[in-house]
């Protein structure tokens, strides 16, 4: 790996997205395309990021299975952010298995988080919870810890466990700030807004008032065992 690619990867890891792009902006080799794609995704230009990552995956040779798998994971993340549930779950699972087999545990864990978040979006809570229980967030970098806590919060919100959700989102926000990734910060803020937005209406004695999720959780009809 040459010095510019190494420097760009280091800048990307520390949240210096523009610095990363500056180092590889004029390059079209596979590692540069991949780094550019990831940087563009984090800057919010998802269509451009998707194009770059597809080009990178094609450009990596057959012996570069790990690099191709990382591109697939990055594409899956873009699909998830775009709420494109048509992205093949099998491709993501294959990429995760490849990364695990080659010792890239951090990216394998990231792929698993993406798979779990997809399960949340399609309403398969029990399966998402089982998969989440098998992940230890302690050794993960800040961005992955934020993603983990977003999944915890997502499950808790859907189960009306609002105290758990707030705690997870507080942890996610702290990790997202440490990661310095604008798109991740925005995702945490969006999830937090759900807790502060009326989710139902209470009609009693001819009067109506909005209820936050905490209040919905507190009503007897909403309690689960």
Language model: regions and residue ranges:
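Tandem amphipathic alpha-helical repeat scaffolds
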Residues: 9-13, 31-44, 67-84, 107-123, ...
């Amino acid at each position: 790996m040459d010095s510019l690619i190494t420097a760009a990867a280091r800048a990307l890891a520390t949240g210096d997205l523009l610095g990363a792009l500056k180092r590889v902006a004029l390059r079209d080799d596979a590692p540069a395309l991949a780094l550019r794609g990831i940087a563009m995704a984090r800057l919010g230009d998802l269509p451009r990021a998707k194009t770059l990552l597809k080009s990178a995956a094609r450009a990596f040779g057959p012996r570069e299975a790990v690099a191709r798998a990382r591109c697939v994971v990055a594409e899956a993340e873009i699909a998830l952010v775009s709420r494109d549930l048509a992205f093949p779950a099998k491709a993501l699972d294959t990429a995760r298995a490849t990364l695990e087999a080659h010792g890239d545990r951090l990216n394998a864990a990231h792929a698993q988080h993406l798979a779990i978040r997809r399960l949340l979006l399609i309403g398969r809570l029990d399966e998402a919870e089982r998969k989440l229980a098998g992940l230890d967030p302690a050794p993960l970098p800040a961005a992955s810890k934020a993603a983990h806590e977003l999944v915890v919060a997502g499950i808790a919100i859907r189960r009306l466990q609002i105290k758990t959700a707030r705690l997870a989102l507080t942890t996610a926000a702290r990790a997202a700030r440490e990661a310095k990734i604008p798109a991740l910060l925005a995702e945490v803020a969006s999830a937090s807004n759900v807790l502060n937005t009326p989710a139902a209406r209470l009609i009693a004695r001819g009067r109506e008032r909005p209820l936050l999720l905490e209040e919905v959780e507190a009503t007897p009809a909403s309690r689960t065992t």
